[in-house]
Amino acid sequence: MKSFICPTLAIDDITLPDTVLTKVVGGSSTYAALASSLFAPTVLGSIVGNDFPEKYLTFLAKRGVDTRGVQHSKKPSFHWVAKYSDDLHDVKTIKNELNAFEDFRVPPLKKYTKGCYSAFISNIDPDIQLKILKLLPKKTITIIDSMDLWMIEKLPALKKAIKLADIFMVSEPEAEVLVQEKLPLPSLIERLMLLGPKVVIYKRGEHGIAMYGKMGTLIVPSYPLTFAVDPSGAGDALGGAIAGVLSRLGRFDRQSMASAMVLGSIIASFTVEGYGTEGLEQVILPEVINRAKVFLSQLPCEDHLNLIKP
């Protein structure tokens, strides 16, 4: 089955500790679509401007991404300018220019959502997320992401979007902004679940990800890397990978979520090893599976408890 990825393709300028990336293809949906397409046929809904390289859309199509839902504007593309701290832990957004995204129309996307088992609606204005959520087929498994800006400026709309979503992805700092209080983790997760999603995926950066909700708790550490050069898009790649894995398996249960989280974590590790989208452009599924097997072999399992007799 297919997955649906929406809505931002962009041109990025990113300052990193060891280099500066200028006018590179970016945007949350680029990372998410590349990740999703490793596991399932992927449909992309977005808009690009007159400066977006047509050859990149051709590349996405060759990777199994249906780009017919990508709209075109005569304005420049969505433009993100950012600078990372020396340790890559923090990023400062210097400029966000909507440009072509001001012309983005949601209703025309409806015909491209048919047959999509899952959908990842990446970080964007919650009012737009709501429109996309409402046009998706009712049985579609929906995943949304957000950021602290919308939690401050568009909280009522964001809460409505979270209530409609099956999976809500959020980082620790964002979660505290959302609930407007610093709480112990169990209380924080309880407050997030009251917003209505079936599952909360708690993004812990270099410490991995955790799942909470109606399917129980799952904790997946990060894959141990020798180096990371660019964290841009890692969370978007995670969301895209989860959508792709769920569509491939055609199931939404604890076991399929465990597979999706492990493979999503591995996809994120490939993402941060390259600049911009390089890591995702070059990786192939057998490499992902091999790294996942190595990763799982490093983790303790229930069998290890058999060594201790009660």
What kind of region is each of these model predictions?
Residues 1-4:
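Extreme N-terminal starter segment of soluble prokaryotic enzymes
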Residues 43, 224-294, 298-299, 304:
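Conserved post-catalytic alpha-helical subdomain immediately downstream of the catalytic base
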Residues 56, 128-135, 156-160:
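A short acidic, amphipathic alpha-helical/loop segment
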Residues 137-141, 148-219, 227:
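Conserved phosphate/ATP/ADP-binding segment of small-molecule kinases
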